[in-house]
Amino acid sequence: MVLIIEIIKIGQIGPIGQRGQSGQRGQSGQRGQSGQIGQSGQSGQSGQIGQIGQIGQIGQIGQIGQIGQIGQIGQIGQIGQIGQIGQIGQIGQIGQARRTGRTGRTVHRRMLQASSSFNISPDISICRRATRNMGEEERPLGC
């Protein structure tokens, strides 16, 4: 017996559709800006020295240590002879201020006594600071 197999023709395969386009790649985000560095603070201005009246002729001044706040004349090294200081009246001859071996700082007793003629109110706290390293027997009167 002969089998006849009828081959069914398959129609033509149509063209393959075009491949779709790939989507566009998104843009990468922008990098944020780095923060600004703050400005460094300004250094404060040094205090102003108040006005000094008039100083007349001064003879010779030896070595002056540190002048503290004027208002009380704090730590003075050695003063030679002072002639006249302008409108403050006269200061006679002041000898040598007593120096201490431990600190090298002095507060002359007569300068503290003369503060009344300068219209200077004594500031005991400054006096204590200036003489805090001195022993009791070394401190000038008024401190």
Swiss-Prot record:
Organism annotation: Aspergillus fumigatus (strain ATCC MYA-4609 / CBS 101355 / FGSC A1100 / Af293) (Neosartorya fumigata)
Residue span of region 29 X 3 AA approximate tandem repeats of G-Q-I/R/S: 11-97
Function per UniProt: Collagen-like protein; part of the subtelomeric hrmA-associated cluster (HAC) containing genes that alter the hyphal surface (such as reduced total chitin or increased beta-glucan exposure) and perturb inter-hyphal interactions within the developing biofilms, resulting in a loss of vertically aligned polarized growing filaments. Consequently, this hypoxia-typic morphotype (called H-MORPH) with altered biofilm architecture leads to increased hypoxia fitness, increased host inflammation, rapid disease progression, and mortality in a murine model of invasive aspergillosis.
Keyword Repeat: yes
A Pfam match: Collagen
G-Q-I/R/S repeats: 11-13, 14-16, 17-19, 20-22, 23-25, 26-28, 29-31, 32-34, 35-37, 38-40, 41-43, 44-46, 47-49, 50-52, 53-55, 56-58, 59-61, 62-64, 65-67, 68-70, 71-73, 74-76, 77-79, 80-82, 83-85, 86-88, 89-91, 92-94, 95-97
One GO CC term, this protein: extracellular region
Protein name: Subtelomeric hrmA-associated cluster protein cgnA
Induction conditions: Expression is regulated by the hypoxia responsive morphology factor A (hrmA).
Region (Disordered): 16-49
Lineage: Eukaryota, Fungi, Dikarya, Ascomycota, Pezizomycotina
Domain Collagen-like, residue spans: 11-68
Keywords: Cell adhesion, Repeat, Secreted, Virulence
Location relative to the cell: Secreted
Chief location: secreted
Superkingdom of the organism of origin: Eukaryota
Biological processes, Gene Ontology terms: cell adhesion
Reported consequences of knocking out the gene: Impairs the formation of the hypoxia-typic morphotype, increases surface adherence and reduces the hypoxia fitness.
Domain notes: Contains a tripeptide G-Q-I/S/R repeated region and lacks a canonical secretion signal.
PANTHER family on file: COLLAGEN ALPHA-1(XXIII) CHAIN-LIKE ISOFORM X2 (PTHR37456:SF6), SI:CH211-266K2.1 (PTHR37456)
Record's keyword annotation contains Secreted: yes
Gene (name only): cgnA
